[in-house]
């Protein structure tokens, strides 16, 4: 179990580091009894402080949250409150998932590998009316593993992570699916080919 707590243009003293570490342990142990790792970064943001929190549970779930506040302690507390609220929402399902570690391990072995890229965004020229001949430049590349999940499990992971979208391998069909947050607050679901798209996310 490794939790890194660091500062970006901020000195993180032992008192703050201890407070954040203890609070993280308290939040996670309420709803999860397995191991975890992660990184919590505190940084200066204007006249206040920002906390970026990413925690990885050994069940395969990633929790992410960020918060801004005038005080570094308050900023960290608020980020962990966000994570606690998400964990509380899925308390029973998280415990069930933790009890199925063997199933999770076998699913990980069968997971599909995919290559992910970061592309350079087109420039924002003030005097340009049209972008022509744009050829995106790959600035980063990595291999990621697409989890085998039901749609309901994918929605849970999307909500817990706070991410805008999630790409996964459908546990029943084996197809690559996408769920994403819609502007109306609902979750869109894309299931190609010939599947449901933008429908109600079910099991």
UniProtKB/Swiss-Prot annotation:
Species for this entry: Bradyrhizobium diazoefficiens (strain JCM 10833 / BCRC 13528 / IAM 13628 / NBRC 14792 / USDA 110)
Protein keywords: Cytoplasm, Translation regulation
* Assembly and binders: Interacts with 100S ribosomes.
GO BP annotations, alphabetical order: negative regulation of translational elongation
Q: What is this protein called?
A: Ribosome hibernation promotion factor
In the UniProt record, the signal sequence range is: none
GO cellular component terms listed in the entry, alphabetical order? cytosolic small ribosomal subunit
Where is it located? Cytoplasm
Per the record, the similarity remark reads: Belongs to the HPF/YfiA ribosome-associated protein family. Long HPF subfamily.
> Where is this protein primarily located?
cytoplasm
GO terms, molecular function: ribosomal small subunit binding
NCBIfam families recorded: yfiA (TIGR00741)
Role of this protein: Required for dimerization of active 70S ribosomes into 100S ribosomes in stationary phase; 100S ribosomes are translationally inactive and sometimes present during exponential growth.
Top-rank taxon of the source lineage equals Bacteria
